[in-house]
Amino acid sequence: MKLNALTYLSLATFSLLVYAACSKDAKKDDPSDVPNPVDSAWTTITDSTINTNNLLVNSSTCPNAPNYGDSIVYVKPKQGGDFFANPVNNIGVNGTYFSWPDGLKINKNSGAINLSQSESGVRYNIAFVKKGTKDTCVSQLIVGGLSYMDAIYVLDQNDTLAKPIFNADPFATSVCDASDDTDYPDNNGNGNNKCVFDDDLPGQKANDQKLRVRTKSGIINLKKSVEDGLFGKNPKNGDSKKVQIRYELNDASQKANQKIAVQVVYYDKASNIPGATQQEVASKRANMLTYKIVNGKPRPPLIIIAGLKK
């Protein structure tokens, strides 16, 4: 899928007029090693510094908008070092790159992205300010991979399964096969040729911590996780656990070893979940479902388990 439009975006912190331009280059991303990449300080931009109310579409005014050859880039297996994606435009053009939301490791001088150290499955805004100008050219880029939707799951409503989403598209068909409750490592589950989940060292698997991740589909059985002791024998309101899941996908990432951490929180009843937390989840879900940037910190996904609705 090619970039067909970029955006003007007004950045409140700098009071700059932000322009967007479409990608005209049909080349695929051409990643290469970049020695000692510098993490851009701009990656700390937060919701309060960005005014998205003036988001406009324009396809011709900003040729310096970062172009990585495609709208999705993927980490790939690499021996001896990290894997990078580089912009295919702005060659020889001096300026500064930055990105938001948090999670992208980008060289502020060259625009090189360290995909091995970036959060995957996330949609990012990437901006470039040409030296000697005040024009901030912005484009969107997705780092391919999976995520889980920020959500509240109510077990007594039979809402028990957290399903992965791929390449920041909540409506995309899964690249993995379906599987059931026979598909766990302690039942000799170890994925298949399409997808492998939770292939980690003994004792470090998500399933070893009682987060029941199916190895072929990546689906998390939340009810089984609680029953098997994710939060201990007697979980309490607000109990929380951050768990890492390793995975490999047989897609454009060519089975590169990737990982995602999820934050799982327990409440006895949905009515016990703090209002601010409910609003945070609702806001992130709304952005994800409408293909918008999830500003601030989209990682880790927040999975809230409530035993009862009321």
What annotation goes with each model-predicted range?
Residues 25-98, 141-210, 255, 260-310:
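Solvent-exposed, low-complexity, repeat-rich "mucin-like" stalks and linkers
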Residues 96-98, 106, 124-128:
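Secondary-structure-rich domain cores
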Residues 103-109:
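Short beta-strand segments within Ig-like beta-sandwich modules, predominantly Fibronectin type-III
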Residues 109-123, 205-240:
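Extracellular/luminal low-complexity segments enriched in Ser/Thr/Pro
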Residues 113, 126, 141, 218-220, ...:
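Hydrophobic beta-strand residues in large extracellular and virion-surface proteins
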Residues 120-135, 139, 227-251:
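A short beta-strand micro-motif common to beta-rich folds, especially ectodomain repeats
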